[in-house]
């Protein structure tokens, strides 16, 4: 009895049997079951052919490529085995026969696709792997990669990028798309980019090492990498994936379309990063190393005062109330106060009411590498939110915090307590319809830029100092030997 292979060869060689193919032993999936087919299984049965020169590379349209949005199939919304068509930019599931990517290639004659996970390019429906140096820029646009040496020199080396339309941009100082009332999201993302310790750590972080996986951290890592990408085709970035992840993780507290307080968002985000990025051995995190300070809190207990060392990542300064009654000459005068007057709160001399209603005195016990200051401008009652427009004047350089350290602290006089401003978030307009923007320092050039969603404008330092600042981030000055915290290898790898 002839084997099946022998019969098949005879049929293939006999022209009379062209219309009589052998019966299939396995039923192929129908078109209606495309979404049920597994790309992984199909690729095992139909492996990609060996590399050949692709004749369709000229059909790729880089202007239509956008990898900032959620990587799901445009038809099934599945996030498994998703490919992007390099001709039209749409996302499709699968690569084997009877998948939507395969069907799209046949119907639209779009033959070049990229895997959104591993950046490999394939030509469909022939299903062969395409390797060409001209595709490297697309892979770097999809998933930017950084070396340790490059990351450590970000704040010292001047680098510029150029979009496909010829527009120049500065990596790290690029606009973020406002997805509907997400300006408060955008300024907090820019704040994290100015903190070199956290930024450098995330740029080099292997997100596969985070167990269990965290979608907030993985999307934040991808977002910051795109912000510093010199190969960005557009010169702007859309934080859509990160905002979606935060919306899910916060159970709708911070989401697209709902305006919120950037201070609350920053607090929530730092706490999450601090929890998820803890070293298993030391129980420390990169967030604690960058923002971790300590306060000596004196609490009134009857006639006595008890003290307790309390950690903090942000300090709050209370702005004095603006005068209610003004004469004709004072109507157009905006009240102004110095930040040093507000910092007297941490000299431990006057008592203040804590959020839980206790009378407390505060002195700084330990200063962080990055000092985050919240200038409390908004007060909320049962009816509305009121904004205090008082201008708080502050130094751009050499903010001396040494006088606020407790005399009992072992850190008194042992550390450099001078800070330089890294960024300042300000609010413009009334509390209901106003918007947030941020002023950031570009360290390689020493220039200041105003970032308001997609708009990036160069500004003078004097303009920054006179804005209605709401959040400030000060960076501790370098020590005498020139060492910087964010270049320390221990701070870059927290998993060893």
Task: Give each language-model segment a name.
Residues 2-496:
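UBL (ubiquitin/ubiquitin-like) substrate-recognition surfaces
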